[in-house]
Design a protein with these regions (language model features):
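N-terminal signal peptide c-region/cleavage motif recognized by signal peptidases
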Residues: 3-5
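Noncatalytic scaffold domains of N-terminal-nucleophile
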Residues: 10-63, 67, 75-238, 243-245, ...
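Internal maturation/activation junctions in enzymes
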Residues: 32, 312-410, 419
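A short acidic/small-residue loop/turn micro-motif
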Residues: 120, 411-413
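A short, polar/charged loop-to-alpha-helix boundary motif
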Residues: 125, 413-422
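Flexible, polar/acidic helix-loop-strand segments at domain edges
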Residues: 298
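Protein kinase glycine-rich loop
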Residues: 302
Length: 422
């Protein structure tokens, strides 16, 4: 990940020793599986900072978050700034029309908050609509009828309104400038756009914005997106209403309905992010938190339960084995298969289906799965997936001890493949 940090007047947990925290570094733990236990040839250096950290998959985004911290903003402001830059430079994975989930830790309250900003389905999305009107047996993966109401902008707004010190005016500035002036397309994004050429060619505006004569731009090309810059500038002036009730909403509805979609102004205007209670498990003394459904985080917690409960049953000591031992990876993979099987079987929208999170995260349930792990052979995965993906992760921490952990996604590479013209 691209990381950056700053030097300024410090407060713990990243600062100099104080009466309240005589050894702040005592909270920094080198986990088994780090460079000290097997990754001796890892090329990237750790980032160690006293006053705040921004970690993203893109150096420009990390720099944007850093700028906000230098200006006196907090971790929430920095997360929105970094995320908005990724909405420009990483549209293979994310964008202003994506969804967002965030965990926000407020140090002054010693409390963790969870934000679900996954957009809901248009009101007319029913099984009958897809089966009878479109002749489909499932929701498509491309085109306007693959896209739900965008949740990301509402999520940014909710975070800033509740915990931030800035607004879109400040936090979107770097993103808007990058969209106007351009950025370099590196290897990862070039690979993704090459793989998505056919998807993008199916949409005239996507082809115009992302391709050159129907082909992916050359590696290391400088990319600009002035229309996206205009949208960001509009939101700097008018806030979230520009997206959900104003000119951007008009453009979304016009595009979707012109191509047989059923998203309406009401679908957009009525959407609100939701603050929810985080879920958690305890793994060897550490409390680990995730978003509840419809987020997929309970699978990670279930996997940790399986590792903790089942490893001793099989005589496996993961810490002692370390990441250079095949049994370490075998056990990890088998635990993940079991957790992902339950994810696919049970996860859904809790407004419409009961997801038995409490039962799935009970350690007695994890114990019931132990005999399904065979240390001598791999099990058959219950779900087979492709290599496609479209998600970013970022995290921020500030001098006051506030922290944000955020996922922002368009589900697959370049999402539905449909872009909205101005």
């Amino acid at each position: 990940m691209a990381s950056t940090f700053l030097s300024a007047q410090s407060q713990n947990p990243f600062g100099i020793p104080s009466e309240e925290a005589p050894a702040p570094s005592s909270n920094i733990v080198a986990a088994p599986g780090s460079r000290a236990q097997g990754w001796l040839n890892q090329g990237r250096s750790e980032v160690i900072a006293r006053h705040g950290v921004v970690a993203t998959s893109d150096s420009l985004a990390a720099q944007a978050g850093l700028e906000i911290l230098q200006q006196g903003g907090n971790a929430i402001d920095a997360a929105v700034a970094a995320g908005s830059v990724l909405d420009v430079t990483s549209q293979n994975d994310t964008g202003i029309a994506g969804d967002l989930f965030a965990l926000v830790y407020i140090a002054a309250e010693k409390k963790l908050y969870a934000l679900n900003s996954a957009g809901w389905a248009p009101a007319r999305w029913t099984p009958e609509f897809f089966k009878k009107e479109l002749g489909l047996d499932r929701v498509p993966v491309t085109g306007v009828n693959a896209a739900t109401v965008p949740g990301a902008i509402s999520g940014y707004d909710a975070m800033l309104n509740r915990f931030g010190t800035m607004g879109f005016k400040e936090t979107f500035e770097r993103a808007a400038r990058i969209a106007e002036e351009g950025w370099g397309q590196g290897e990862r994004r070039h690979r993704d756009i090459v793989s998505a050429e056919q998807r993008l060619r199916q949409d005239d505006y996507s082809a115009e914005v992302f391709l050159e004569d129907g082909k992916a731009p050359h590696l290391y090309s400088i990319i600009r997106n002035p229309d996206l810059a205009d949208a960001l500038r509009l939101m700097q002036e008018e806030g979230r209403d520009a997206f959900y009730k104003g000119a951007i909403a008009d453009a979304i509805v016009a595009k979707v309905q012109s191509e047989g979609g059923v998203m309406t102004h009401a679908d957009l205007a009525e959407f609100e992010s939701e603050w929810v209670e985080p879920i958690n498990t305890n793994y060897h003394g550490y409390d680990i938190y995730q978003l509840p459904p419809p987020g997929q985080g309970f699978a990670a917690l279930e996997m940790l339960n399986i590792l903790e409960v089942c490893a001793p049953e099989h005589g496996v000591n993961l810490a002692a084995l370390g990441p250079s031992h095949p049994d370490y990876w075998h056990f990890m993979v088998e635990a993940k298969k079991l957790a992902y099987s339950d994810l696919q079987a049970y996860n859904g929208d809790p407004l419409f289906s009961a997801v038995p999170v409490t039962e799935l995260l009970n350690k007695n349930y994890a114990a019931s799965l132990c005999d399904r792990i065979d240390m001598d052979k791999a099990s058959e995965p219950s779900v087979k997936g492709g290599l496609d993906g479209g998600t970013i992760y970022l995290t921020t921490a500030d001098r006051w001890g506030n922290m944000v952990s955020l996922i922002h996604s368009v589900f697959s590479v370049y999402g539905s493949g449909s872009a909205i013209p101005p």
